[in-house]
Regions:
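A structural motif detector for short, solvent-exposed N-terminal "entry" segments of globular domains
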Residues: 2-44
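Exported/periplasmic cell-wall-interacting domains
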Residues: 4-13, 43-50, 59-134
Length: 134
């Protein structure tokens, strides 16, 4: 499981780290742990894209209602993935999305205001039963 205290970041850079196994999003600010949020991530059959990405586009009140009240798009080259709110709050804490990161609307609204464009987003962790990389 991801443990925020083990990460060392550049002093001024904000960063988001998402642990798919734990369904947790950690926000670092000024190089220090700032806030931990529960989230929903992709199903094992439609996984969230593990790797290092960046927030490249943000919108308040996206037209597509299932995205909740905020959308923060990531620069994943093979699809459209982002961090967003939800119209299904019961889904938070589960592997249930098509790969995006879902948050409670009040949490994504708070995070949205803290995250500038270009913020690094690291998606880490394994799904249960997934083989460990050599």
């Amino acid at each position: 499981m991801f443990r925020p205290r083990h990460w060392v970041l550049a002093a001024e850079a904000p960063e988001i780290v998402i642990d798919v196994q734990a369904c947790l999003l950690t926000f670092f600010r000024m190089g220090r742990f700032h806030r931990l949020y529960p989230c929903a991530v992709g199903r094992p059959s439609t996984p969230s894209p593990r790797g290092q990405w960046h927030v490249v586009f943000k919108v308040e009140h996206p037209e597509w209602a299932v995205l909740g009240t905020r959308w923060m798009e990531l620069d994943v080259p093979w699809g459209r993935y982002g961090i967003h709110g939800t119209n299904a709050p019961w889904s938070i804490g589960h592997w249930i999305s098509n790969g995006c990161i879902r948050m409670y609307n009040q949490d994504v609204e708070e995070l949205y205001d803290l995250v500038p464009l270009g913020t690094p987003v690291r998606i880490v962790g394994r799904y249960p039963g997934e083989p460990v990389a050599a």
